[in-house]
Amino acid sequence: MTLVSQIEAILFVVGEEGIGLEELAYLLEKSTAKTYEELTKLKEHYASDNKSALNILEVGNHFVLTTKKKYASLLKKYAQSPMSNALSQAALETLSIIAYKQPISRIEIDEIRGVQTSGSIQKLVARQLIEEKGRVDGPGRAILYGTTKYFMDYFGLKSLDELPDIQQMEDELEEELPMDLFFDRYQETNPMSETTEGEEA
């Protein structure tokens, strides 16, 4: 397991939030200089590899794993296709957690679901069901997510008070994720949609 491969794995897991240089160095137990050196190697590797669609975007001392610009039209085509519009069970479960626990970070959602949820979050953001509600104070400045006005309209809610009792929700979370409200209403508006098991975008 090389240092470069460890960096690649971390960048993949943190998703669109990216990660700061100091936090990455801390996780790797390396100096910031050494970490940046290895990051640069990975960035140059992606840039020179015509068979890779990946790229590392550097903003200040923050790094995000992205796709290369030349794939933008292809990804836009996918985003607009009917196949991409259906929300998976994983996305609906993620949405229910955000609705009840907002504002909440991706890491907190991951801990509740027990799996990595960046794909579901990206899908929900693209569908305008959730949005950024601020940042966590501290290292990394993780994004906090919450539901949108479109979410309220989409599920026929006038306010979050119309959701089932939060204490009951927290009790149920210990056994099974409560997504029935969202699943039923989503199925009503998307009768041809199919949900799949596991984490899907």
From Swiss-Prot:
* Major localization class: cytoplasm
- The answer to whether the entry has keyword Cytoplasm is yes
Q: Which InterPro entries match?
A: ScpB_csome_segregation, WH-like_DNA-bd_sf, WH_DNA-bd_sf
The Gene Ontology biological process annotation of the record reads:
cell division; chromosome separation; DNA replication
Q: Which UniProt keywords apply?
A: Cell cycle, Cell division, Chromosome partition, Cytoplasm
Task: Tell me the compartments it is located in.
Answer: Cytoplasm
Question: What cellular component terms from Gene Ontology apply here?
Answer: cytoplasm
The family database entries (Pfam families) matched by this protein are listed as: SMC_ScpB
Known role: Participates in chromosomal partition during cell division. May act via the formation of a condensin-like complex containing Smc and ScpA that pull DNA away from mid-cell into both cell halves.
Matching PANTHER family, A to Z? SEGREGATION AND CONDENSATION PROTEIN B (PTHR34298:SF2)
Q: Subunit composition?
A: Homodimer. Homodimerization may be required to stabilize the binding of ScpA to the Smc head domains. Component of a cohesin-like complex composed of ScpA, ScpB and the Smc homodimer, in which ScpA and ScpB bind to the head domain of Smc. The presence of the three proteins is required for the association of the complex with DNA.
**Family label:** Belongs to the ScpB family.
Name of the protein: Segregation and condensation protein B
